[in-house]
Amino acid sequence: MTKFIFVTGGVVSSLGKGIAAASIAAILESRGLNVTMLKLDPYINVDPGTMSPFQHGEVFVTDDGAETDLDLGHYERFIDSTMTRRNSFSTGQVYENVIAKERRGDYLGGTVQVIPHITDEIKRRIHEGAAGYDVAIVEIGGTVGDIESLPFLEAIRQMRSQLGRNNTLFAHLSYVPYIAAAGEIKTKPTQHTVKEMLSIGLQPDILICRMDRTMPADERRKIALFCNVEERAIVGSYDVDSIYECPEMLHDQGIDNIITEQLQLNVQQADLTAWKKIVHAIQNPKHTVKIAMVGKYVDLTESYKSLIEALKHAGIHTETDVQITFVDSENIEKNKGDVSMLKDMDAILVPGGFGSRGVEGKIAAVRYARENNVPYLGICLGMQIALIEYARDVAGLKGANSTEFDLKCAAPVVALIDEWQTADGSVETRDESTDLGGTMRLGAQEVELKAGSLAAKIYGSGHIRERHRHRYEVNNNYVPTLEQAGLVIGGVSAGRERLVETIELPNHPWFFACQFHPEFTSNPRKGHPLFTAFVKAALNNKKA
């Protein structure tokens, strides 16, 4: 029978529930357990696919093509399980399914209510996502006390009642602030958030206290007394330089022993050797490189979370401190293509994105990298931008652009593909009036790499599988012209469309761009060959 750990948060949002939950999962996995994780989001959006990155941060794409919360990226980076669409759902999805059942008559004319119909659907989805695992860690988004979270909290209250204390555990994160003016740690917010939980029938088994300093013993005793939690189950989650220090930090306080005892799990001792090696590599780099990330969401770096982590992973595996400088492509555009801020950079990266804002600034950055032999990595839109720049400035295609930015451009080298065959053989059609939500090329796709190409050299294989998230594709009608001008198409999709997947420049020290998102499959234990190669290229440029 699967055991459940429910992770909630109180006082304020952005406490790090996802990191705490993933760290617990990593510790339990090191003890020989088969662990999965679920994220339950209280918002009414069906998924975050059409939400602004400034509001939601990154959209993480699973192997099976679900657009999910960025916390699922943390889950995959901390444990070996691959997330699927079953590992994430929102209020919108729950209501959508319940309403569809009502319309079909599944409820036999009964009155459809939050309890039991909505809560039953939530429980059904939790059990579905947890099936086949020893332990499922379920993170409830939002903050306890929010109206939006109530159906989810009621559902897990029912699960405790139905499954019992030895099969369920509640871990609650709370903020314990230090008031500098008073010189004191304040426990009152934690007392109030636990009171809020008790009012809806939830008693935390573990309290994880987010703090910027070590918790004094007397404050720990005070929290235990007022919150009715064992003193040893008051666990500190302190500010650290790297999130990969968190598993060891929580393990050192015995959190896994508390969990295994309550859930009656007879398992081996934790082995965090791999995590210790990762932390040691982060703390003891031998080299340093500066990489410019030129994008339009740079004011909220959470928009590029997986990408930032993938570069850090490459740093771990090359013993390098990867220093990322975020460059707003709009500023380049406003300053008439001034890229002087890139001159001290060892490499340049243009990430994915949507819309025309800041595009010409990105094109200027690509031009600088190409003309000055600076290592360049383009991802998704970053590949399309590189291709547009090459089409304009090298292949001589005047008016080259993407129809995403200019529907009537003279040379649409990137365009909306209006028809293709999906993995199951059905034909998808798209046009300008198609709904935005769920209408992209999503999830893992097969890619064939050209023998002798930089792509094949990086991956060490002629066939790879990478995750995608985009609507627009390179227009194959222009490929012969671009190839005649020296552009190398190093990878194409394995389907009948033969869509362009990677491009490279043979006469450049290191110039590579891909339509897919390799950052979604990087983790600190293994890294990713593409990012490792990119950081090595930056190191070589630095030495030169």
UniProtKB/Swiss-Prot annotation:
Magnesium is among the record's keywords: yes
GO biological process: 'de novo' CTP biosynthetic process; CTP biosynthetic process; pyrimidine nucleobase biosynthetic process
Regulation of catalytic or functional activity: Allosterically activated by GTP, when glutamine is the substrate; GTP has no effect on the reaction when ammonia is the substrate. The allosteric effector GTP functions by stabilizing the protein conformation that binds the tetrahedral intermediate(s) formed during glutamine hydrolysis. Inhibited by the product CTP, via allosteric rather than competitive inhibition.
Region of interest (Amidoligase domain), residue spans: 1-265
GO molecular function: ATP binding; CTP synthase activity; glutaminase activity; identical protein binding; metal ion binding
InterPro entries assigned to the protein according to its UniProt record, in alphabetical order: Class_I_gatase-like, CTP_synthase, CTP_synthase_N, GATASE, GATase1_CTP_Synthase, P-loop_NTPase
Protein's pathway: Pyrimidine metabolism; CTP biosynthesis via de novo pathway; CTP from UDP: step 2/2
Residues that hold ATP according to the record: S14, L15, G16, K17, G18, I19, D71
Domain Glutamine amidotransferase type-1: 290-544
Active site: C380, H517, E519
Highest taxon in the source lineage: Bacteria
Binding site residues for UTP: S13, K186, T187, K188, P189, T190, Q191, K222
EC numbers for this chain: 6.3.4.2
Pfam short name (any one): CTP_synth_N
Catalysed transformations (reactions): UTP + L-glutamine + ATP + H2O = CTP + L-glutamate + ADP + phosphate + 2 H(+); L-glutamine + H2O = L-glutamate + NH4(+); UTP + NH4(+) + ATP = CTP + ADP + phosphate + 2 H(+)
Residue numbers binding CTP: S13, D146, I147, E148, K186, T187, K188, P189, T190, Q191, K222
Keywords, comma-separated and alphabetical: ATP-binding, Glutamine amidotransferase, Ligase, Magnesium, Metal-binding, Nucleotide-binding, Pyrimidine biosynthesis
Note: CTPSs have evolved a hybrid strategy for distinguishing between UTP and CTP. The overlapping regions of the product feedback inhibitory and substrate sites recognize a common feature in both compounds, the triphosphate moiety. To differentiate isosteric substrate and product pyrimidine rings, an additional pocket far from the expected kinase/ligase catalytic site, specifically recognizes the cytosine and ribose portions of the product inhibitor.
HAMAP family assigned: PyrG (MF_01227)
Function: Catalyzes the ATP-dependent amination of UTP to CTP with either L-glutamine or ammonia as the source of nitrogen. Regulates intracellular CTP levels through interactions with the four ribonucleotide triphosphates.
NCBIfam families xrefs: PRK05380.1 (NF003792), PyrG (TIGR00337)
Family: Belongs to the CTP synthase family.
Quaternary organization: Homotetramer.
Protein name: CTP synthase
Species for this entry: Neisseria meningitidis serogroup B (strain ATCC BAA-335 / MC58)
